[in-house]
Amino acid sequence: NMAAEQDQVNAMTTIGWNYFLGGKGAEQNNEEAIYWNERASKLGFSIASYNIGFFYYSGLAGLEQDLLKAKKYWLLSASQWIDSLNHGDSTPEGLLEEINSFNKNPSKEMIELRDWFIKLLRSIPA
């Protein structure tokens, strides 16, 4: 059942994000945040792949900043984005806003990577 599977990866991703932020019934826990997003990413869910890339990009969830790993996950996210089921109601604009709100003083490399990723998502037919 596609819908059930879809709900499942969506739920995993939401659980992972709640562990990252702490709240909505989840104690802040970086290992759990990464674990649930990794699982959903492996199942093809674009937003989970984006989240892991976002953690590497921002140096969050207990990960060292690593723009190469961020790019790898964001490329994966873009390749999974094609099917709207795989990114829920997320939009490139929404992700851009989120990236910016967590990264107030991005380096030149960060700005280039961010702009490349958002442009890539925008190029995918809705």
Cite the ranges covered by each PLM segment.
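Short coil/turn connectors between adjacent alpha-helices in alpha-solenoid helical repeat scaffolds
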Residues: L21-N30, L60-L67, S107-E109
